[in-house]
Amino acid sequence: MRVRLSSALRPRWRYVTFKVWSERVEALDFGGMKDLVVRALLSVLGPTGTGRIGPWLVRSYRDLNAGILRVRRGQEEEARAALSLYRRDPKLGRVFIEVLGTSGTIKGAERYLSRIPKWDRERVGNREFVLYENGEVDVVEDGRIVAFASFECPLPEENRG
């Protein structure tokens, strides 16, 4: 028979929401996201530091390249720092993991996903353009981002103050 610990003795958890930006534009499935998080934590914190924070990938959002990572309470700042410091991945090339926020519940962590800008893809010839709702554009060739820019739509004359 399995003995349950009282709620006072069980570990407390925090949930870190993050988004992966990489040089190679590809959607990461759950396994790829898990491998990336493990490589990031091990490269920055080492095996003992990674074990201390007790990471567990709870959710992966393939369409957003985002995820929710469960860590021990009190260790969330170490996890945030380790994810943010990871810069080069053997499979994805240059990578940036943007930490969107931390929460005490999964539902609260999912609210941070609304901060990710929506995007659409357009193909012109051999180039692909990734258009974001906030006015940014990425130029993609052969699966790699080769240029990025942002633009502002000028206001019509009657709307200028």
Curated annotation (Swiss-Prot):
One GO cellular component this record assigns the protein to is: cytoplasm
* Record key words, sorted: Cytoplasm, Endonuclease, Hydrolase, Nuclease, tRNA processing
The primary site where this protein sits is cytoplasm
Q: Determine the domain of life of the protein's source.
A: Archaea
Please report which protein family the annotation says this sequence is part of: Belongs to the eukaryotic/archaeal RNase P protein component 2 family.
Question: What does the record give as the reaction this protein catalyses?
Answer: Endonucleolytic cleavage of RNA, removing 5'-extranucleotides from tRNA precursor
Reported function: Part of ribonuclease P, a protein complex that generates mature tRNA molecules by cleaving their 5'-ends.
The name this protein carries in UniProt is: Ribonuclease P protein component 2
Subunit and partners: Consists of a catalytic RNA component and at least 4-5 protein subunits.
- GO biological process entries: tRNA 5'-leader removal
The keyword Protein biosynthesis is assigned to this record: no
InterPro entries on file:
Pop5/Rpp14/Rnp2-like, Rnp2-like_sf
Q: What is the lineage of its organism?
A: Archaea, Methanobacteriati, Methanobacteriota, Methanomada group, Methanopyri
Q: Which GO terms describe its molecular function?
A: ribonuclease P activity
The subcellular localization recorded is: Cytoplasm
For whether the record's keyword set contains Transcription regulation, the answer is: no
Q: What is its EC number?
A: 3.1.26.5
